[in-house]
Design a protein with these regions (language model features):
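The feature marks the mature, well-folded catalytic cores of soluble enzymes
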Residues: 1-307
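Intrinsic disorder at enzyme termini
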Residues: 6-34, 403, 410-481
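Helix N-cap / loop-to-helix initiation motif
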Residues: 90, 320, 379-380
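A glycine-rich phosphate-binding loop feature that marks nucleotide/adenosyl-phosphate handling sites
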Residues: 93, 269-282, 316, 327-331, ...
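Predominant activation on well-ordered alpha-helical scaffold segments within soluble catalytic domains
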Residues: 124, 250-253, 318, 381-384, ...
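Ferredoxin-type iron-sulfur electron-transfer modules in oxidoreductases and energy-metabolism complexes
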Residues: 282-311, 327-446
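Conserved, hydrophobic alpha-helical core segments of structured domains
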Residues: 312-319
Length: 481
């Protein structure tokens, strides 16, 4: 489960990540590849990409506008299909439901497909404390589980590791011969996982789309582990955020056509798993029981807000991370949240409280690239600006925990004075002259002045040079008026 993170904690982890040159090299190489793949695919294959984005936006906004009705419809149809539906108001309830299902059947080992919802609720840690092993089956998730790390990316969990590092991890943790060729590394993981599939009785997955009209769930993946996790075990449990609903298969297909191109620059994922319930009479495979946990975890409160509800449109493609100039320098771990990158900056304070994630809105350059590339047109940059306003007490104050993050009266007064000076040319030039004169004294006092000491603890105040205004006047060939 998520916890409070101080500004100092953020400063330490960001400094550490920036100093890891191998991490930065790995991230930059991966981000460059993902961006190029997306750009080339859209250019060569999707002449109506912007129209498709608009359709995707409409699909999500339609479902969010009547989510309560669609939840009831989904529950009715899924129940008729044989699913057992559970509602969880938060992560604690979701974890307890899964534990009780396992306890009831004396299950001590559980297979897991990649699921950000399970990361959000801290499922693996919870089960471990209860004496139950949760075994990851996604290749990226397996890698980070072996080294006890959290996912660094919402689509590619181990994207911060190169093949040589992965080879060493497999050598140390799986007692395999050192390899660094991707095909051989995959073979090592496959051999390890095939043994696991034979002995597990419960499989846990996420959900990409929950189809209200059909009472079915749709899972996409590239490795086949999802199909094994949901069909080879006696019990399948799917954790589904309530925002994952869509009305029908046509709507789901629109979002699916946006997902893979945006995520990794391919037309479609290798495996499309549409699950309509447990094994029926005459079926050769499939689980004997199928459960769906509909997870709220503060999503209802986000939905009720006139602006932030748009964040619930997210289809978890990760393209905003791939295009973010902050993320590709510091990676996902620096956000100290299940959800990193621009979408994480928006949803983490909503889900877990701005009081716990007060620093995260600062991890943004406000360049707006995330908004430009989002496949369902979430105005991420605008929402991040709103969060910053809420953080300092200048916004609507609707975010969970916002009241405890607001600036002091002195800070508010200082920023208002700065805004007045910065918007008046004459006052601004006068202040620049004063800043040049008092620059040495400012450097000396900055570490102890209440309003700037935190800033000064991680930054060096530069020498105030002659103003640009003055420099322009002395340029040859420039007429200054």
């Amino acid at each position: 489960m998520e916890k409070y993170h101080s500004d100092q904690e953020y400063e330490e982890v960001i400094t550490d990540q920036l100093g890891d040159m191998q991490l930065r090299e790995n991230l930059r190489s991966a981000m460059d590849t993902l961006r190029a793949n997306r750009k080339n695919l859209i250019k060569n294959r999707y002449s109506e990409w912007e129209n498709l984005r608009e359709l995707g936006k409409e699909v999500k906004l339609k479902i969010l506008s009547r989510l309560d009705e669609y939840l009831e419809l989904f529950e009715k149809n899924a129940t008729q299909n044989g699913f057992k539906i559970h509602y969880a108001k938060d992560g604690d309830e979701a974890n307890e439901i899964i534990y009780n299902l396992a306890k009831e059947k004396n299950i001590k080992r559980i297979l897991k497909q990649k699921s950000m919802a399970s990361e959000e609720i801290g499922l693996n840690h919870y089960l471990k404390e209860k004496g139950i092993q949760a075994q990851e089956t996604d290749l990226g998730e397996l890698i980070i589980q072996l080294i006890n790390e959290h996912p660094v990316h919402i689509v590619v969990p181990a994207i911060h590791k190169n093949r040589k590092q992965i080879g060493k991890i497999f050598e140390e943790k799986l007692n395999a011969a050192y390899e660094e060729e991707p095909e051989k590394l995959n073979a090592i993981a496959r051999k390890h996982m095939r043994k696991e599939f034979e002995s597990f009785k419960m499989g846990i997955s996420g959900v990409n789309f929950a189809i209200a009209n059909e009472g079915a769930i749709w899972l996409v993946e590239n490795e086949g582990n999802g199909r094994m996790s949901t069909t080879a075990c006696d019990v399948h449990v799917a954790i589904c955020g309530i925002e994952k609903l869509v009305e029908n298969f046509d709507d789901a297909a629109i979002l699916n056509n946006l997902l893979a191109p945006s995520a990794v620059g391919v037309p479609i994922t290798c495996y499309q798993n549409i699950i309509t319930g447990p094994r029926k009479e005459g079926d050769l495979d499939g689980p004997k029981e199928a459960h769906i946990i509909l997870l709220d975890n503060n999503r209802s409160n986000i939905l009720a807000d006139e602006k932030y509800y748009r964040a619930l449109s997210c289809i978890r493609c990760g393209t905003c991370l791939n295009h973010c100039p902050v993320y590709d320098k510091i990676g996902g771990h620096a956000y100290l949240s299940t959800y990193p990158g621009p979408i994480g900056v928006v949803v983490s304070p909503q889900l877990f409280g701005l009081n716990n994630y007060g620093h995260i809105p600062n991890l943004c350059s406000l360049c707006g690239r995330c908004t430009e590339v989002c496949p369902v047109e979430i105005p991420l940059a605008e929402l991040i600006r709103d969060l910053r306003s809420d953080k300092v007490g200048e916004g609507r104050g609707v975010v969970k925990g916002a009241k405890s993050t607001q600036h002091s009266g002195m800070e508010k007064f200082s920023m208002k004075m700065f805004a007045k000076m910065a918007s008046d040319g004459a006052k601004w030039r006068f202040q620049l002259k004063m800043a040049q004169f008092f620059s040495p004294l400012g450097k000396l006092l900055a570490p102890i002045l209440p309003l700037v000491k935190e800033w000064a603890s991680v930054r060096t105040l530069p020498n105030m040079d002659t103003s640009l205004h003055a420099k322009v006047q002395h340029l040859e060939g420039v007429i200054y008026e």
